[in-house]
A protein has these predicted regions:
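A generic local secondary-structure boundary/capping motif
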Residues: 4, 73-75, 95-98, 122-131, ...
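Residue-level recognition of short, solvent-exposed, well-ordered loop/turn junctions
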Residues: 78, 132-134, 243, 267-268
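Structural signature of FAD isoalloxazine-binding scaffolds in flavoprotein oxidoreductases
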Residues: 101-118, 133, 267-278
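RNA pseudouridine synthases
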Residues: 141-163
Length: 291
């Protein structure tokens, strides 16, 4: 199933189930009416405490009454405990950067305040001069996880979504670390919804594309990951407890602006569209804003 947070025409926030084709929605109140299940108000309780599994038993009789285009899609998981990101976790991206891939995850954390809606503007401070894009598969952790073996690591996954790891390269290179240049407010658009893990038979075989103003910039596959998702989860769980709602963004493939001979960094008004097979599409306009 696909689960989303939405805002309707009455400016009311709730959550919904998305139809298989990604075109229609069923709101929380409608789910309750059609199934008779007293589902909770909070999306985290709905997805992490077993209520979604109850609803799945009624999937065949659900009737989707509204179009996705009639609502605003919001950040799927509000206030995640942490956002863990991987650097240089694709062979093609590491090669373009002239680096040898690491056997262990190279990680950094993004602040929750960087999260952004899947179709909302990315607001870039005017002092940023080299703004870059990074399409990534994000994993949503579904249960508390500590020291999980690799062969059981995917049991901890609730689902997957797209995350755009927007990056201010000038700040990143100046600081010689990732957090400030990747942690600016709105620099993590994500969604458009969470696709539950049962719909993704092989997360290591998903096609990934990024287009800027219609021009394809990234065109790769998660099969190019250096460290696969199951090993990422296992490795992280050795040093930190993973919690329900944690987001793990698994790195980006080749094609980013900084690796070009003549870098095409993002400019004011550019539109970045990221599509990942089975996960959907997010689209964001770049808006430079003075301090």
């Amino acid at each position: 199933m696909k689960v989303a947070r939405i805002r309707d025409s009455k400016v009311k926030e709730t959550y919904s189930i998305i139809s298989d084709d990604g075109k229609s929605i069923l709101t929380r109140s409608e789910i309750q009416q059609q199934t008779g299940i007293p589902i909770p108000m909070n999306i985290k309780d709905f997805v992490f405490r077993g209520w979604l599994d109850e609803v799945k038993h009624h999937k065949a009789k659900l009737k989707f009454n509204h179009k996705v285009s009639d609502v605003d899609l919001l950040v799927p998981i509000p206030n995640p405990p942490k956002i863990v990101c991987l650097a240089f976790n694709y062979y093609d991206h590491a090669r373009d950067a002239g680096l040898t891939p690491s056997d262990e995850p190279v990680i950094f954390l993004k602040p929750r305040t960087a999260l952004n809606e899947p179709f909302k503007d990315i607001i870039c401070p005017s002092f940023v001069t080299r703004l870059d894009y990074e399409a990534e598969i994000a994993v949503i952790i579904g249960k508390e996880t500590k020291k999980v073996p690799e062969d059981k690591a995917l049991d901890s996954v609730f689902g997957y979504m797209i995350l755009h790891d927007v990056s201010a390269r000038d700040i990143q290179f100046k600081d010689k670390q990732f957090t400030r240049g990747k942690g600016i407010d709105t620099f993590a658009p994500c969604g458009p919804w969470i696709t539950t893990k049962d719909e993704i038979s092989d997360p290591q075989n998903l096609h990934i594309t990024t287009k800027v103003n219609g021009e394809t910039r990234q065109d790769s596959s998660s099969s190019n990951m250096v460290i696969p998702i199951r090993r990422i989860i296992s490795s992280l769980s050795v040093t930190m407890t993973l919690e329900p709602g944690d987001i793990i963004s698994t790195g980006t493939p080749a094609g980013v602006a900084m690796s070009m001979k003549e870098p095409k960094y993002l400019k004011d008004g550019d539109v970045v569209e990221i599509t990942i097979e089975r996960l959907g599409t997010i689209r964001n306009r770049i808006v430079y804003h003075p301090l």
